[in-house]
């Protein structure tokens, strides 16, 4: 039986689903706009420059640190042969890679063997960090995704 209470419930369900959908569209676009600004990234390879190794001495005087370069993308830190005598650390800008990524701030990818990783970040000199971790700015999307999925399921099952 169709009642006014059901109509209000359906209306709220649709409104919540629409707001959730708009949130998923709007948030990535605002994040992508921030990536167009220039940032500074360290540019070095520990194979040829010991200053590039971990742990990185970010408290050293600028002249004692690896060179900085202006970057119109994201900073990258790549590690090969992690935690071994052959460990190699490379810090650079994504403009030097043949890669097209969106919203990669504080994202790390592990090598399949587990002996290396590659991390991306979007703040000045952020590739000096020994460990880049997710900063939690995108974690609020998980409950929204669950709620929107549940609401869409409820809406489609009626």
Curated annotation (Swiss-Prot):
Expressed in mushroom body (at protein level); overlaps with expression of Sh/shaker and nicotinic acetylcholine receptor (nAChR) components also involved in sleep regulation. Expressed in the adult brain and head. Enriched in the mushroom body, anterior optic tubercle, superior protocerebrum, antennal nerve and visual projection neuron fibers projecting into the lobula plate of the optic lobe. It holds the Pfam family QVR. GO terms for biological process: negative regulation of membrane potential; positive regulation of circadian sleep/wake cycle, sleep; regulation of circadian sleep/wake cycle, sleep; regulation of synaptic transmission, cholinergic; rhythmic process; sleep. Residues 54-67 are annotated as: Loop 1. Its main location: membrane. CDD domains: TFP_LU_ECD_Qvr (cd23595). Consists of a single Ly-6 domain, adopting a three finger fold stabilized by 5 disulfide bonds. The first loop contains a region essential for protein folding or that is required for localization to the cell surface. The second loop mediates protein-protein interactions. The chain crosses the membrane at residues 136-156. Glycans are attached at residue 57. This is UPAR/Ly6 domain-containing protein qvr. Belongs to the quiver family. A lipid is attached at residue 127 (GPI-anchor amidated asparagine). Residues 77-91 are annotated as: Loop 2. It comes from Drosophila sechellia (Fruit fly). Interacts (via loop 2 of the three-fingered Ly-6 domain) with Sh/shaker; this interaction may stabilize both components of the complex and may be required for targeting or retention of Sh/shaker to neural cell projections. Interacts (via loop 2 of the three-fingered Ly-6 domain) with nAChRalpha3 and potentially other nicotinic acetylcholine receptors; this interaction is required for antagonism of nicotinic acetylcholine receptors. N-glycosylated probably on Asn-57. Bifunctional regulator of neuronal activity in the mushroom body, and possibly other regions of the brain, that acts as a signaling molecule required for homeostatic regulation of sleep under normal conditions and after sleep deprivation. Reduces neuronal excitability by enhancing Sh/shaker K(+) channel activity; possibly by stabilizing Sh/shaker to increase protein levels, accelerating its activation kinetics, slowing C-type inactivation and enhancing recovery from inactivation. Specifically affects the A-type K(+) current.
